[in-house]
């Protein structure tokens, strides 16, 4: 690679967030390139030349046609790929859901695949990422916003655009498949694609610009592979108005603990003295704190000098507590208001053997035939569906309750669990022993808490979306170690509900023909 092209890619990676958003119709060219978002140069995976991947936007009701073009060449980060559009229900388009070996075979290098899906009734803050092994940790991850022209919160803010999306990224100097199976911490935290590591104390930091007197809707997106972050902005309170694509009753906080894959919209009133203020995202482990500007970005008021802040952090007195979150509009909780008061209740027992995680004594090993293809080919029962012990058929039009008790047998807690194809009611949250069947928040990623707190997080949802849907820990290193199951929802109706395009059917024969070095 010539020096000119090399510099071009590095420069691109540093200005990722200055590029225009794409969508709802777009091509995403997935490639390998050297990048240095924290001042340390490494090969990574870029989309349309940038890390993090570009912001995708659209409006409620849009049809998204996202053509993924795989030009990957570096086998250490895998040459194939598969992209999940996180938080979208994909009703009728389970084939476009993205998880490799659950909903599709990966896209081979040198090939492309069109993800074509509607978003009829969702709006809010989402994201997208590779769903093949630990590939998203190497760069294939970015924000996705669906705007609501009739947003019920519109009167609460003045500005909501590309400049008010905030991404939090754990960044590693070693490719995920070449590093430890379970890393002991990231090398840097990137906020909007920029950050510092211990070895790069002069790297550029992201600047978030505001104008005094205006109210901003910031969309905070954790595109983390592992740590959760405690997010705050010196001198400012934050009013949370959206949780994982669900409008919520306004809640005033001064810090937000955000777990991998979660999203929050908050309104910030730029009513403080014109100046520079530290934006902080402290990981729960690894290189913590803010010495030398690590884990930080800058909130800069118009008219403030171009300088690093001198503000200090004050102790959080009104942190975000999940049980204080409630939907803006009433969302009835499925089932009756007693523990187990549903059509089907499942308890998930976690375990770990030093190498792999287990749920109810099974570790998830990706099958050679995607679960969706198994169902379309006639497999119907848990006995028929692979991987054995990891696929749970769920009846149609039923209420489901899942309990996820925290246990010392599954280290690395708190584990954030994500259910595909649904938002669920969090009827018991981490840190709480009470059950709320009246007005709990609905979301798609929930912290399962810690064994020390005796947590027994409980969620509920309705089976109204035929297809195989992943439920997994969103710490990507844990998912890769088998911390997942699949719900095969309403198996009998999957085929009729999800007609698949020929291009989807072609993915497996192409992928299966690859040598291991080309996968």
Swiss-Prot record:
Entry annotated with the keyword Ubl conjugation: no
Sequence positions that bind Cu cation 3: 131, 420, 472
Binding annotation for Cu cation 1: 84, 418
Disulfide links within the chain: 105-508, 137-225
Domain Plastocyanin-like residues, every copy: 22-147, 159-301, 368-490
Protein family: Belongs to the multicopper oxidase family.
Protein name listed in UniProt: Laccase-2
Organism: Trametes villosa
Gene: LCC2
